[in-house]
Amino acid sequence: MKFEIRQIDAWFDGEAWTYNESFRIGEFSTRAENVKRAFCRALHGLGVVFYRGRVVVVDDGDCLEIQNRKSGEPLFVAIPMD
């Protein structure tokens, strides 16, 4: 499965986070069962590193989001291309 990676600029409207703008920064493909881990490794390969425990990977069924653990702010998203 192939994914497009986007960096997210989002704002909080009081109830939920809304994407304001996104920037394509790369893509990755994987056959692994653990797609969340493959997403994190792809970001690491692009030079994006997170402190342990600061982010969480959320799979909503349509895409994967890396969110700030405390605020829930989306930072990166992986969107399926196939």
Where are these predicted regions, by residue range?
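A short, exposed loop/beta-hairpin motif centered on an aromatic-Gly-Thr core
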Residues: 19-33
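Short amphipathic, charge-patterned alpha-helical segments
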Residues: 35-42
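Residue-level detector of intrinsically disordered/flexible regions characterized by low predicted structural confidence
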Residues: 4, 22, 70-72
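Secondary-structure boundary/capping motif
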Residues: 2, 25-27, 74-75
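A short beta-strand micro-motif
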Residues: 3-10
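Short, mixed-charge low-complexity intrinsically disordered segments
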Residues: 44-82
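Short N-terminal binding/cap micro-motifs at the start of the first secondary-structure element
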Residues: 12-17
